[in-house]
Regions:
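Active-site neighborhood of phospho(di)ester-bond hydrolases with catalytic His/Asp-centered motifs
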Residues: 10-12, 49-55, 79-85, 152-157
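N-terminal active-site segment of His-dependent metallophosphoesterases
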Residues: 1-67
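Solvent-exposed loop/turn segments at secondary-structure junctions
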Residues: 14, 56-58, 85-89, 121, ...
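His/acidic metal-ligating clusters that form di-metal
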Residues: 35-50, 128-161
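Active-site-proximal beta-strand elements of phosphoester/diester hydrolases
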Residues: 5-18, 112-121, 154-159
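Aromatic-residue detector
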Residues: 8-9, 24-26, 30, 47-49, ...
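Extended active-site neighborhood of metal-dependent phosphoesterases/phosphodiesterases
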Residues: 62-149
Length: 161
């Protein structure tokens, strides 16, 4: 039976480590991640899509990205992600050329267009401030303009840049 709604699971700031005993702010992030996933599996239906919004791997290690991919495979849902300031793009790219995990800048889901915004100009930085580059703003503006001039349905939307 077709549902009349869409379920999105957003995960953010996982700060996981390759070392299972790794701590972030005195919290074992792997244990916390496992508890969150277990709770979701027990109490919610399968999401239609999973979106991870930055700081997946605190250490940026390839093994950490593999661990995340394996853990999320249990949902059988496509995964989209944008990296954070603790992530390491080259290591993520080694692991995530998977069919079900992508770093696309947008995703289409039912009647929804989700635009992922990269506010990270300095991967692996210790800075906590995000910054959206001029090129990223131009990409977002172009994407929004496309849908304003090619709408799936009639809407009123005003953009200020």
């Amino acid at each position: 039976m077709k549902r009349d709604y869409t379920t999105v699971l957003q995960l953010t700031d996982l700060h996981l480590f390759a070392d299972p005993a790794g701590l972030f702010n005195n919290i074992n992030t792997r244990d916390s991640f496992a508890k969150v996933l277990s709770h979701i599996h027990q109490h919610y239906e399968r999401p239609d899509i999973i979106i991870i919004t930055g700081d997946m791997a605190h250490d940026g290690a390839t093994e950490t990205y593999r661990f995340i991919a394996e853990a999320l495979k249990t949902f059988s849902a496509p995964v989209f992600y944008v990296l954070g300031n603790h992530d390491h793009p080259e290591n993520a790219d080694q692991v995530y050329p998977l069919e079900w995990v992508t770093t696309s800048d947008h995703c289409l889901l039912s009647d929804w267009q989700i635009i992922l915004v990269d506010s990270n100009n300095q991967p692996m930085a210790d800075s906590y401030e995000g910054e959206i580059s001029h090129s990223e703003l131009q990409r977002i503006k172009a994407g929004l303009n496309y849908f304003i001039f090619n709408p799936a349905f009639s809407i009123s939307l005003f953009l200020l840049f």
